[in-house]
Design a protein with these regions (language model features):
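Preference for intrinsically disordered or flexible, low-complexity segments
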Residues: 1-226
Length: 226
């Protein structure tokens, strides 16, 4: 049965069971392949990183028939992600926030199709894994509140980002939706190793997502690594 999580903060875990919350990797659930974002530098299809459904949060944050899919321009050559493409995705200090407008990642709000599609070389796709959520325990909450600038360092939904470099301050239009820790994903699937430069991916969603149309940008995604 597909249900929303309860109130409070949750860790993101990888599971074999589809609970209707979303998935890492795989293709994209696009009803129109023309919506698939292309890398502005190379013209090649971007890589789907994660898809989140409207059930991911305790309250409705998306229209009922929509999902958010995060795409990123990551070059994967011989199993190693090109450092140049990772640097384009990295926002390590506030002065680099202009990278968010350069189009090397896209948080796409779209209707969910009946099946996945793939544009380009399917061999480039990440392995598909379903998303699960586990409520924070007392230890997790203590870690979340311990530092003045950063929250807990696991993959999680909501809360505060755990910054690996400088804190990044976003426009009030966007809120922190989730962070994804590469090391946790890599322990489940070695194909994720190096995806974020051994770092973390940060997803910020548009406060207005419930009012936006189909096939539009509805947030920002970037990474930090040390």
């Amino acid at each position: 049965m597909q249900t929303r999580p309860g109130p409070g903060l949750h860790k993101i875990v990888v599971t074999d069971q589809d609970g209707g919350l979303g998935q890492f990797g795989g293709g994209a659930w696009l009803h129109d392949a023309a919506l698939w974002p292309m890398d502005p530098s190379t013209g090649r299809p971007m890589l789907p990183i994660v898809m989140l459904t409207g059930l991911f949060l305790p309250t409705a944050y998306l229209p009922d028939d929509r999902v958010l899919t995060v795409f990123a321009s990551i070059e994967r050559s011989g199993g190693v992600d090109g450092r140049s493409s990772l640097r384009r995705l990295a926002v390590n200090q506030q002065g680099e926030s202009d990278k968010l407008a350069q189009g090397h990642s896209k948080v796409l709000l779209h209707r969910r199709a009946a099946q996945e599609v793939c544009v380009g070389d399917s061999a480039r796709l990440l392995g598909r894994h379903f998303i699960g959520l586990q409520p924070f325990d007392d230890h997790d909450m203590a870690e979340e509140l311990e530092d003045e600038d950063s929250g807990a360092g696991m993959s999680k939904q909501l809360g505060r980002p755990c910054w690996l470099q400088d804190p990044i301050y976003m426009s009030p239009r966007y809120y922190f939706l989730a962070q994804f820790v590469e090391a946790e994903l890599g322990r489940v699937d070695s194909g994720y190793a190096g995806l974020f430069g051994d770092g973390t991916g940060y997803l910020f969603a548009d406060q207005r997502a419930r009012k936006l149309g189909d096939g539009v940008a509805a947030g920002h995604f970037f990474i930090q690594f040390t």
